[in-house]
Amino acid sequence: MLKRLLGDSVSLVFGNLETVFKVCGSWFILQFALMMLIRLATGGADSQSADPGAMVLLSLVMLMFALASSASIGVAWHRFGLLGETPGLIHLRVGGVELKFILKSLLLALIFVCVWLLVGFVQVAIGVPVVTGVFAVLLLIFAIPTFLRLSLILPATAVEKPISLGEAYAISEGLGWRMFFASLILSLPFVLAGILFQYLLQGMAGSLPIILLQFKLMLLNVLLQIIVTVLGISVLTAGYRMAMEAHSSPDPSVFQ
């Protein structure tokens, strides 16, 4: 099952790189432009020296952008993987399906926050760090696979066949940890490569203008984010496809 998750996710992404950049390209170009504008506007000032009101407004703008872009990319990629639906060259769609996707994402985020609030409550109630640490580890052992199984509501929402949290959990038995390890295995090489490239570029800082160095670092981060993002989404796409195969005839797909 893990092997299939890995194989399906890799083939979906690296067998369709043109579609990857159609789905993500416009949003990441906007993100890159926004990052450059922020750097130019703030002049590299840190958050402590910046105007608090401006920082709050900036944070809200970034949050709204992140929600819109992640939903648009997630919906488009799930629909491509499960329905074979290919977006246009410029993909910036945020419609009804994307808004539902955002609401489901916020629901999952709320569940995640509640888990950490429970850990905080135990720390306050008991006040023994070792006990809290053990409790947190035990809770995570249960929470990680459960959270990923519940996350199958996202691809279901994207293809407009919504399911409840209970249904997502019921159809995904055995997939939780496998989706976690698949995501880890697929993303780790790119994360490490990003760290290595940043280290190498910083080592060249003396021979490059600072603005050029920042430009290269941001461009590198954007490219790596695209690959890591679609790989993570693809694991959920593949997991949903596998979970649904036993319950209905699979939709036409590009997992070939």
Predicted regions and their residues:
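Interfacial aromatic "cap" segments that immediately flank transmembrane helices
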Residues: 1-33, 91-114, 145-193, 237, ...
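Membrane-proximal helix-loop-helix units in multi-pass membrane proteins
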Residues: 114-141, 148-152, 159
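Hydrophobic alpha-helical membrane segments, chiefly transmembrane helices and signal peptide h-regions
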Residues: 63, 67, 114, 137-140, ...
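Membrane-anchoring/interfacial helices and their immediately flanking loops
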Residues: 26-61
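Alpha-helical transmembrane segments and their membrane-interface junctions
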Residues: 109-127, 187-204
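Residue-level signature of transmembrane alpha-helical entry/exit and packing/kink sites
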Residues: 19-23, 55-59, 63, 100-101, ...
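Juxtamembrane transition segments at transmembrane-helix termini in multipass membrane proteins
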Residues: 47-56, 65, 69-88, 149-161, ...
